[in-house]
Amino acid sequence: MGQPEFIEQTSRRLIENDIAERTRIHQSEIARFQAAQDGARTLKVKSRNTPYTMLAQGDSWFDYPLTGNTLPYARTDVIAQLGKMGSTPPKILNLAHHGDAATEEMSLPKQERMITALRDRANWLHGKPDAILFSAGGNDIAGNQFCIFLDFNDGHSTGLNADRFNKALGIVEACYLALFALRDRLAPGVPVFSHCYDFPIPNGVSPWCIGPWLKPSIDFCNWTVPQGKAIVHDALVAFRVMLKRLESDAANNFHVVETQGILKPADWANELHPHPAGFKKIAQKFATALGHKLQKRVPYEAPVA
């Protein structure tokens, strides 16, 4: 076995072990709530508020293992923040992994992992999750491949090549549709919630271990940082339009959490990721959207700005 194959297999085992540990912790928490409910029924007393249970799949916005750009290693992402919100915080089985593109999130192994999770009743209080949370699309565009979607600045081009970018969005859209189809088979009626990221600054800032993701392509295609910021803005607006089109089809049972324009420049740790306080702002938007849409009970308190 060559070194690349060894590294890949080792990385895969680490991810599988991490997901298994997350699942073990999640199931132990669900079992405690189930036991409390059973005890309340036996004693014929009112049970305390029952938390929502949710399945999360996604990228680094749902699985960010850094504090900004530095140590300590600590999950500060949207799911970590959301799991601490409200008088009865939701219990979220998080299958997300940083760095995953939408095509990876909906690849055969990841779909099989979601199917296993959805079928395991030990993960849910009512046989299936109350919601599925999905973060996908950013890694399909950002990175060394970002230059594919840019015109070279020869003094006449406008920046984002809409034709090439829309073709990439078509692949991302197909991944969302694949998720809806999987949900319809395994957990019919469960709503899917996603988000549209926010407008980053392509300034080359990144953690020590990875990145940058945007400025190298901006430089390669002869654009300035202010011009690059406008290009990234246009790309994310187009991404949101695609998501809103999916949301407009009631059959998709899909809800877009409006996250664009929320973060201030100081909220960004690097080109793609907020500081913990920025992730908390995004999580608060999820909490509000979930509270509005899941009307059978409202375990969330109003988020604090």
Which residue stretches match the model-derived regions?
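N-terminal secretory targeting modules
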Residues: 1-57, 61-80, 84-87, 298-305
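Substrate-gating cap/lid alpha-helix
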Residues: 202-255
